[in-house]
Swiss-Prot record:
Gene3D superfamilies: 3.40.1370.10
SUPFAM superfamilies assigned to the protein according to its UniProt record, in alphabetical order: Ribosomal protein L4
Molecular function (Gene Ontology), one example: rRNA binding
GO CC annotation, single: ribosome
Residues covered by region (Disordered): 41-60, 67-98
Stretch forming the signal peptide: none
Protein known as: Large ribosomal subunit protein uL4
Family: Belongs to the universal ribosomal protein uL4 family.
Domain of life, per lineage: Bacteria
Keywords: Ribonucleoprotein, Ribosomal protein, RNA-binding, rRNA-binding
Keyword Nucleotide-binding carried by entry: no
């Protein structure tokens, strides 16, 4: 399997062979969905909390006697129906994390990478290096590649100049190749990778590296 490599001017300079184990996997929608949901769930802190009637400050004394006042019966001030009372059935701290087997996580990554390639949403450039931070230069490269936003750019070793050149462009996100994940790839229409990033991904997510 071969894929064209572009330069900064958007011209094809060569073709490289890529691993079918990583970029030629049939798309499994159920698996990708499960991996995406697990990643989103694992990102939740689960620390939101409310106080019950047993935790709010205040007396537990009955406000007035049960009968003879003409008013509706009422207990403590900490009742959920009273102002400043406790919260009934409010959120409590909980663990939202979901376990996903390692083989399933790895296969889901391969599925999305293969889908990006098959649908024409993956482009490979020879390199993305800048002598100084220049947002204009990065914007020119993306325009030459004719990529559609939102765009995810993955490089093997991002430096400060590269990060600063891309961070002010709307709908453009950068990431190290070894941190590619389901959520970022699905949330961004286009995936741009350097040639070295492709090799790093093949080494990391290939069938032989477990």
């Amino acid at each position: 399997m071969e894929i064209p490599v572009y330069n900064a001017s958007g011209e094809i300079i060569k073709n490289i062979s890529i691993s079918e184990d990583v970029f030629g996997v049939p798309f499994n929608e159920a698996l990708v969905h499960q991996a995406f949901v697990a990643q989103q769930a694992n990102a939740r802190q689960g620390t939101q909390s409310t106080k019950t009637r047993g935790e709010v400050q205040g007396s537990s004394r009955k406000i007035y006697r049960q009968k003879g006042t003409g008013n509706a019966r009422m207990g403590t001030n900490r009742s959920p129906v009273r102002r400043h009372g406790g919260v009934a059935f409010g959120p409590r701290p909980r663990d939202f994390s979901k376990d996903l087997p390692k083989k399933m996580r790895r296969q889901a990554i391969r599925c999305v990478l293969s889908f990006k390639l098959e649908s024409g949403e993956l482009k490979v450039v020879d390199q993305l290096s800048f002598d100084e931070p220049k947002t204009r230069d990065m914007a020119k490269i993306l325009a030459a590649l004719q990529v559609m936003s939102p765009t995810l750019i993955a490089v093997d070793n991002p430096d400060t100049n590269f990060i600063k050149s891309a961070r002010n462009i709307p709908a453009v996100k950068t990431t190290p190749a070894n941190l590619l994940n389901i959520s970022d790839m699905l949330r961004n229409k286009q995936l741009v990778m350097t040639e070295e990033a492709v090799r790093q991904v093949e080494e990391l997510w290939g069938q032989r590296s477990r």
